[in-house]
Amino acid sequence: MESDKNGPARQENDIAEKESDIRYWTRVVCPSVRSLLHAAGSYTAEDIEAQMRTLREVVLPDLGPRPSRAPGPSYLFQGGCPFQLSINTTSKANAVRYVWEVLGERGHTSDDPLAMQTTRDTVSRLSAKFGLSTKWSDVLLSALELTTKEAQKAVEKMPEWILEHLEKGAVVPRIKNLPFGFVAFDLKESDVSIKLYITLKAREIFTGKSAADVIFDSLRNFTPAFKPEAIDMIQNFLSGLSEKMPLEVIAIDCVDEAHLSEARVKLYCHSTSNSFNTVKKWLTIGGKVKDENTLKGLQILRSMWHLFIQKPEGIPDDELETPVNLENALKHRMYFSFELKPGQDIPQVKTYLPIWRYAPSDEQAIDNFEAAFRQCHHPWGEDGTYGRIFRNALCAPPIHGDLAYIYCEKRGVYQTIYVTPPLLEED
């Protein structure tokens, strides 16, 4: 009888705690999202309210317990928040997107140490709600998942792996878990387009072997099919690098069955070099891609490179290796992504810089980004506009996370700036 009495009471307490969790994440996340939606200038008032409803109803419950109840912090982004905002800027329009680590109630508990089952459950829930195909996600999750015991073993092996990959002189972080799955929403008017990201590192830490072959074998069996030559181009390039296990994350567009032929796969990799010659090597895929679009994009990027690596005075040559902030840092200096589409001959390559590792302060980063915007004739470079937008969206530093760059003839310079809301004191 005692258990019967306690059952409803526990249930009521669980409901109350979950409501408190959502109130907390509402305070952390919603003001920044609303602020950037307004600043983008691309959304009507009705669009903004629709996007805020989607955020509250679909995303906030998936962020898991608030920090005081969570089994451990999120390590996906700087500052411990499992949610990151970004804004895509071009000369024609700006767009907001966000990404969150899939945690839910059970993620990082003993039942689901790396939130792998939680990721699968979330994918199933989103696919049912938005009518998405799971053909690609099922293949990737099955290829990269571990059992509960294997996941726990991977967690136990993490300290050794971190020491091996840490910058010399960096502070050793006390990491208790590892991100596995995260989801992104690109906000398009009142709708969203969805991406799923899955990290390879848990499997690699557990097995001690690269998971790249597993990924490339999976891609070769996807339908609609990718061109084997495009997959080979990426695989051969990566196998010729000095970096050990450079492939970090795979992402897929989540679409309905009828639009799989238009969906993309993106492969995210790290580089331990940050010279501009390294950028050239990656963007041309080892010198194999030298079309007019790629070369023009490189020329424009070179003209702004000193601003992105926070060297406004300029750099002497393309061999320069720029020192980075060392605290809690792996040996990763830059990131690149390869984008594949079914039937596409040549992958597209995008450059990513972890700005928090380069900028001595947010104020200097703001000055440098405003200078870069002026070079692109973007209005955010004028009269301190960029600085005001991000100070309004994020009440406390650090503001800057990462920067992404790609050029295409249709859209011109396409930059994405990533920012993470700070965690707040709990009520």
Curated annotation (Swiss-Prot):
Following inactivation of the gene, the phenotype reported is: Abolishes the production of all prenylated paspalitrems, but accumulates paspalinine and small quantities of paspaline. Simultaneous disruption of idtB, idtC, idtF and idtG eliminates the biosynthesis of the whole spectrum of indole-diterpenes reported to be produced by C.paspali, including paspaline, paxilline, paspalinine, paspalitrem A and paspalitrem B.
The UniProt annotation places substrate binding at R97, K195, R264, K266, Y268, Y352
Molecular function terms, GO-annotated: transferase activity, transferring alkyl or aryl (other than methyl) groups
Looking at its record, which EC class is this enzyme? transferase
**What keyword terms does UniProt attach to this protein?**
Transferase
What is the top-level taxon of the source organism?
A: Eukaryota
A GO biological process this protein is involved in?
Answer: alkaloid metabolic process
- Describe which pathway this protein belongs to, using the record's wording: Secondary metabolite biosynthesis
Signal peptide region: none
Any idea what job this protein has? Indole diterpene prenyltransferase; part of the gene cluster that mediates the biosynthesis of paspalitrems, indole-diterpene (IDT) mycotoxins that are potent tremorgens in mammals. The geranylgeranyl diphosphate (GGPP) synthase idtG is proposed to catalyze the first step in IDT biosynthesis via catalysis of a series of iterative condensations of isopentenyl diphosphate (IPP) with dimethylallyl diphosphate (DMAPP), geranyl diphosphate (GPP), and farnesyl diphosphate (FPP), to form GGPP.
The entry's family comment says: Belongs to the tryptophan dimethylallyltransferase family.
Q: What is this protein called?
A: Indole diterpene prenyltransferase idtF
